[in-house]
Amino acid sequence: EVLAKVGQANPGLLAHDMRKAARAREVLREIPIKDLVEMMKKAGDLYLNATLPLGDGVQSPDDFARQQSASTGLPEHMCKFNMEKNHFVLNHMDQILDALTRGLDISILERGFGVEDRGVPISYQAQSPVLGMVLPSNSPGVHTLWMPVIPMQIGLILKPGPQEPWTPYRMFAAFTEAGVPKEAIGIYPGGGEMGAETVSRCGRVMIFGST
């Protein structure tokens, strides 16, 4: 049974697009972090409950769980459990950012500098306009690790695992439906060469497995 036909990106496409990587951060910096956090909450509800665009068709939540199960071998009930986990993270993004930054005033991240409660000047500067993610095929749960990136006003370059393109595409549909600019996220399906190109081109990367 054919579940989907996924067009493959090539390294040259990513090399071309990375010339405009700064645009991903620029469009996100035009939106206050508190508004991006609210978009994450809306996106979480859409991801869990809505029928969303996928390619030239649409995908319901049940379609998603069934297709992910078929391509990864993960039982459907585990696929739905991971959906609920992703939804939980998106719906508690304000608390997660507070924990990750140890209670830092979010306006300091927006400006890049500020003063701590104890009166110490601090500065945070982005080291890359985008974070590259080389994602696995067999562990959909790792997607929670990149969800805080967009509300921190950093763009995403996603290289999906060959057997698990479902989550990146559904998340992209939910994010953009919730108001996140499309320029902030790029998805580049492909083989090992695309994973290597993602690592090579992005200033900051998280990688899982060999592809």
PLM regions and their residue ranges:
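Rossmann-like NAD(P) dinucleotide-binding subdomain of oxidoreductase/dehydrogenase enzymes
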Residues: 104-211
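N-terminal Rossmann-like NAD(P)+-binding subdomain of aldehyde/semialdehyde dehydrogenases
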Residues: 1-117
